[in-house]
Amino acid sequence: MSLKITWLGHAAFLLQTETLRVLLDPYRAPDVGTYLPIDTPADVVLVSHLNPKYHSYWEAAVGNPMRLNGLDLSMMPEGIEAHGVRFRAVQVWESPARDVPVSMPYFTLDGVSVCHSGDLGHGLTADEVEPIKGVDVFLAVTGGSPTVPVLDLKAAIDLIRPKIVIPMHYQNGKINLSLRPVDDLLALFDPAQIDHHPSSELEVSPSTLPAETRVVVLPSAR
């Protein structure tokens, strides 16, 4: 068994096991730039917060999936179980002022734990890190302002100690936001820790996880 992770573009990912398809933070094309429409079947759509343009376009999923909002989950200590998976979230904030709540959803599929950093806009405290410490895969919002500054992101990664970091939410010529490129984050890592994957899909299983943190850069599928 393995978990297939596809970076669709911006903050959107499709996570697939043999029996389940989870869509994370789908955007609304063409309103976000030149990213193509997502239009993919899903069993669950999980969003970090409500922002239909960039993070919560429910209609990007084909079919009749369950809809989960990470902000709701963050208010439930046990989260919600759906399709045999326990979905939880940590409440964080969209800016250093900590005035607009967002969330970082986390869950485990096929033995691989995953956390999506949503629209995180600040450095993380030890209490905020605790529920996701040691997560296998961290989907990291990387483009800097208006989201978390890259130095604060690196500090958070050092606290979380994920096995794999997959950058997202950065400027790659497709998004119509003023974001920084992924190279700003990569410059803070040893080049030996960085993999530029040729495909937008990455297959991960508990037996293939690296011993130490690696950054895996995926091209967008859309």
Identify the residue ranges that each predicted region occupies:
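Active-site-proximal loop/helix segments of hydrolase catalytic cores
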Residues: W93-I160, L177
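Pre-active-site segment of Zn-dependent metallo-hydrolases
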Residues: A12-P77, R88-V100, L120-P131
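P-loop/Walker A phosphate-binding loop and immediately adjacent motor/lid segment at beta-alpha junctions
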Residues: W7, Y57-V90, A155-M168, A187, ...
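Active-site-proximal beta-strand elements of phosphoester/diester hydrolases
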Residues: K4-W7, R21-D25, G84-W93, M104-Y106, ...
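Conserved acidic residues
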Residues: A42-D43, D136, K163
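Zn-dependent metallo-beta-lactamase
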Residues: M1-E18, G70-L73, G79, V90, ...
